[in-house]
From Swiss-Prot:
It comes from the Bacteria. One of its GO terms (molecular function) is lipoyl(octanoyl) transferase activity. The keyword Phosphoprotein does not apply. Pfam families: LplA-B_cat. Keywords: Acyltransferase, Cytoplasm, Transferase. It catalyses: octanoyl-[ACP] + L-lysyl-[protein] = N(6)-octanoyl-L-lysyl-[protein] + holo-[ACP] + H(+). InterPro entries: aa-tRNA-synth_II/BPL/LPL, BPL_LPL_catalytic, Octanoyltransferase, Octanoyltransferase_CS. Residues 32-207 form the BPL/LPL catalytic domain. This is Octanoyltransferase. Its EC number is 2.3.1.181. The gene is lipB. NCBIfam families: lipB, PRK14342.1. Gene3D superfamilies: Bira Bifunctional Protein, Domain 2. It comes from Shewanella sp. (strain W3-18-1).
């Protein structure tokens, strides 16, 4: 039976690697009673290269570090002004498949943007969320021990220039867009609050418990 409680962890601004390793640790040590969690964070500038990533898609990293990680997908960029959300969900317990979880994540972004009269959509062959053929959110997951980690990145109010140093998600010339320019959420905090609502509604969580920072390990 699915626990209908979702724990929301507000991590503020944190470096990528420490949060990544904390996600791995939570996933590796959780059991059938461990709660599902949603981690909300903002990272300093970093390129992350997924398991399908090819080095030729990093055109000119410059002074921005590149980290090889254990999620699906190819290269993407994280930076200030971008909302990053990591759903740590026991999909085995929740009885949902990986594809269904991806669809739920994409739809939660689409539903959130619809509140601002922004018509966003997903693409079957290219995970993420798009507005007028420009990408507003990227997505990459890893499933281990029947549980998800990694997640989504929504462009809110950031410098989009570093995306031009890569082929985002392996697509040359893919244009990026952000919510502030479209009349959507103006801050990462606002976007996080709204996305938490649409995500929890779609996955059937009825009780949200908020925490500041990571749990003591």
């Amino acid at each position: 039976m699915q626990d209908t409680t979702l724990h929301i962890r507000h991590l503020g601004k944190q470096d990528y690697e420490s949060v990544w390793h904390a996600m791995q640790h939570y996933t590796d040590t959780r059991n059938s009673e461990s709660p599902d969690e949603l981690w909300i964070v903002e990272h300093p500038p970093v390129f992350t290269q997924g398991q399908a990533g090819k080095s030729e898609h990093i055109l000119n990293a410059g002074d921005i570090p590149v980290i090889q990680v254990d999620r699906g997908g190819q290269v993407t960029y994280h930076g200030p002004g971008q909302l990053v959300v990591y759903p740590l969900i026991d999909i085995k317990r929740s009885k949902i498949g990986v594809r269904q979880l991806v669809t739920h994540i994409e739809q939660s972004i689409i539903n959130m943007l619809a509140k601002y009269d922004i018509q966003a959509y997903a693409k079957a062959d290219a995970p993420g969320v798009y507005v007028n053929e420009r990408k507003i959110a990227s997505l990459g997951l890893r499933i281990r021990r029947g549980c998800s980690f990694h997640g989504l990145a929504l462009n809110v109010d950031m410098d989009l220039a570093p995306f031009r140093r890569i082929n985002p998600c392996g697509y040359a010339g893919l244009e990026m867009v952000q919510s502030k320019a479209l009349g959507g959420p103006q801050t990462v905090t606002e976007a996080g609050e709204q996305l938490t609502i649409t995500f929890s509604q779609l996955l059937g969580y009825q009780h949200l418990v908020h925490h500041q920072g990571l749990a003591a390990s």
